[in-house]
Amino acid sequence: MKKIIIGIDISKEKIDASAIDVRNSQLGVLKLDYQVFENRPMGFRRMLVWAKHLIKGVTLEEVMFCCETTGGYDRCLCDYLFAKGLDIWRESSLQIKKSCGLRKGKDDKADSLTIAEYAMRHMDKAVYYVSPSETVRELKALLLYRRKLEQEKTSKKVRVAELKATAAKSKSVSFILRDAQKSIRALEKSIKECEKQILAL
C-alpha cells in the first residue's frame, strides 16, 4: 500500500508535481505540496530531493508517482524513476479524463492534483512502468524512421505525378522531375537499408 502519491503533469519543458498523503484518505486527502521542475535530468533530481523532504517517516519505495501518457514527453522521467527503483504509473490521459470529468481550460497545477487523486482512487489498478529493453527501443526508432521515409517518398511521387499532369514542358520542369526521381531512388535505398537494420536486431 502506497502512502504518498505524487501526480505529475508533464509538458515538453516542465513537470508540475502535486503530492498528497493518502494514509488517512477516509478523513480526506491531505495535500502536501506542489512544485514545478524542468523536464530534464536535473529537474528529475530536484523533484526527488523535494519528495524526500516531504515524506518524513516514509521511504521513497512507499511513494507512487503517476503521470499521463504524453506522446513521449514523459518517457525520460519514467526511465529515470524506473532506473532508481521507484514506481511510476503511466495512465492514459483519456482514462483520467473519463474518470474525473472534463477539465475546463489548461491548469497544470490543478491537473497534477487531479492525476494524484485519480491514482489514489484507482491504486488497485496501477500498472507500473517497466523500461523497455534497448532492442525494443532501437526497433521503435527504426520503424518510426522507416515510416517517415515512406511518407517522404509518397509525397515526392505525388509531386512528380502532379507536375507530369499539369506543368508545361520546360528546362526547369525537366530538372525538377529528374531531381525528384533521384531523391525517390535515394529514399528507396534508405528504406531498404533501414529494413536491413530492423532484420538485424
Residues of each region from the PLM?
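Long, charge-rich intrinsically disordered scaffolds of nucleic-acid metabolism proteins
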Residues: 82, 89-201
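Short amphipathic alpha-helical segments
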Residues: 19-21, 77-79, 161
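Gly/Thr-rich phosphate-binding beta-strand-loop-beta motif of the actin/hexokinase/Hsp70
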Residues: 1-23, 115, 149
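Acidic, metal-coordinating catalytic cores used for nucleic-acid/nucleotide bond scission
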Residues: 63-76
